[in-house]
Every structure is written in C-alpha cells, then in structure tokens.
C-alpha cells in the first residue's frame, strides 16, 4: 500500500465526525486553521532544492546564527475556496483536489461540479497564490496547508489526494507533486509543465523519487492549439520517462488553446487520474532504475576525475551540471564533492 503523510492519515481518521457539521456545496473565502507540519521552509527546501544548494543554505544559516522561518504563511490570514460534494463521503473518505490557479482566486467551475460530485471529491484552491506569489514561500506552502486543513475538517482518503493547476499554477503543481509524493497521489497538469533536471524542477531526495516513480500519476491536459505548452509537455514527458516515472497520461483538448478543461475533458482526465493504480511493471522499472543509476554514477565519476586531476574549475562546472540534472539522486556524493571543490578553491586564493 502506498505510503501517506502520517499527519494527513491521522487527521483523516480523526475527522469523520466533522463531516456532520462542516459545510457542503461551494464555499468561498474559507479559513482552514490546521497548518501542515510539512510546509516549513526548511522541509520545502530539502525537498525542492538541489542537494548542494540545500547544503550551502544549511551551512550559511548555521554559520550566521540565523534561523529559517519555520512557516512563511500566516495560516490565520490564509483563505481558500472550497467545493464539497453534497452526497455522503465514500467509505474510505472523500477524494481531494488541491487546485493552484495562475490568478489570485479560482472557485470550482460549474462545469466541474458534476464530475467532482460523481467522484466524491472535494475541491480546494488557495487565494492569493497566483503567478505573482513566490513559489516556495507562498504557493507551495498554501497547497500543503490546503490538503492538511481539508483533511482536518472532512474525512479524506489519503490514497486519493491530488494536486493540479492551470498555466503557471500547473508548473507549481508539478513541483508540489514531485516534492511531496508522500502526500499527493497524482497531478492534473493543465497547460504548464517542466522537465525534471531543468533549472525549474529538481529531482527530490532518492527515497521520495522512488515513491514518485511508482505511486504518482501525471495527467497532462493541454489545448491542441496551445503549441508552446504542448512542446513543454513533450519535454516534461520525456524527462519522466528518463526518470522512470510509470504513470503518465497525455490528453489533448480538441480545438482549444490556452484554457482550462471543459466539462467533458475534466471528466475524462479525472476518470484516469482517480482510477485504481495498476500494479507496477517491476522488471521494466528495475531496468530503468539501473540505467538511471549508471548515468548518475558516470557523471559523478567525471567530476571526481577532474577533481583528482587538479582542475577545480572544470570539476565545479561539471558538478553544477550533474547537481541540476540529477538532484537528490546524486546525493550524498554530490555534496561531498562540492565541499571538496570549495575547500580546494579556498586554498588557492
């Protein structure tokens, strides 16, 4: 059985009586007063930054005597738009879709409500989390607070918690899903995506990456005429294949451009996203993982060779490339090499 965040599992179990008094239907400007313990600045950085970047950050903070703010969002001031199905929750609890919009507010569209009702799925979208908001300080924490806060108020099935978004919100949703596969089971990526290993999207620590490979579904939903984002989707999907991600689905929305899914498209995509997860193809997965590990080792071996040969600058450049490309899969060796290079450069000054 797929792992889930302990806090969300506990809150889901404790929240069953809350459904008797919590609101149903569409609710605007809602306050959720149960902050996520996984939304602290350090934890987000650990999961989203490259290992060498996170190590430098930690050493800087330690050396300066400062401390990272544990929470960058005041949950008491945060507001959310929510839709709760009117029918009773399924036996294991409601499904949940956390939606990250590109604008400051996005209530559940009327076109989506029949599908949300049919799936027994709650919709929640944070306010003031649009493209102008800082990703790591506000957009990601609010998505985590939304998931945790809803699970504190309603019975939620931790195996059916999803994140999604449109345009820039979709890119943020992919970051959230990649960094938190222990919270989210899938992502609805609507007209916005990035490739793992690019400057925008870092592979998380190895244990989280392995979980992401097998338990997180990615549904790419983009208009047929939205050519820039179709190209971005193609690059993102190639990277998912390279990083051994098993559950990827592409859905093109007919003659539409840069737009959110209409009722029919939303229904089709959610049917795939919310279906039972099929068994993993272990043989194919292990073959892919072996090849991936070999490529990581080869890049790190190149860095070691340059470092042992005394070419610190070239070693640093090669390590920078490997650190960005492989992220958490290259740790802890990438961190050890970075420290050696930094020490060597300091000694030559």
Language-model regions, residue ranges each:
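Bacterial N-terminal signal peptides
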Residues: 7-18
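Short beta-strand element of the alpha/beta-hydrolase
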Residues: 92-103
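Short amphipathic alpha-helix adjacent to the substrate-entry channel of hydrolases
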Residues: 108-125
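A domain-start/cap signature at the N-terminus of enzymes
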Residues: 20-94, 299, 303
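Alpha/beta-hydrolase-fold serine-hydrolase catalytic core, especially in secreted/extracellular enzymes
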Residues: 25-37, 243-247, 264-349
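Gly/Ser-rich "nucleophile elbow"/oxyanion-hole loop immediately N-terminal to the catalytic nucleophile
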Residues: 86-93, 135-167, 183
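Primarily recognizes the serine-hydrolase "nucleophile elbow" in alpha/beta-hydrolase
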Residues: 159-212
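The feature captures the conserved acid-bearing segment of alpha/beta-hydrolase catalytic domains
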Residues: 193-270
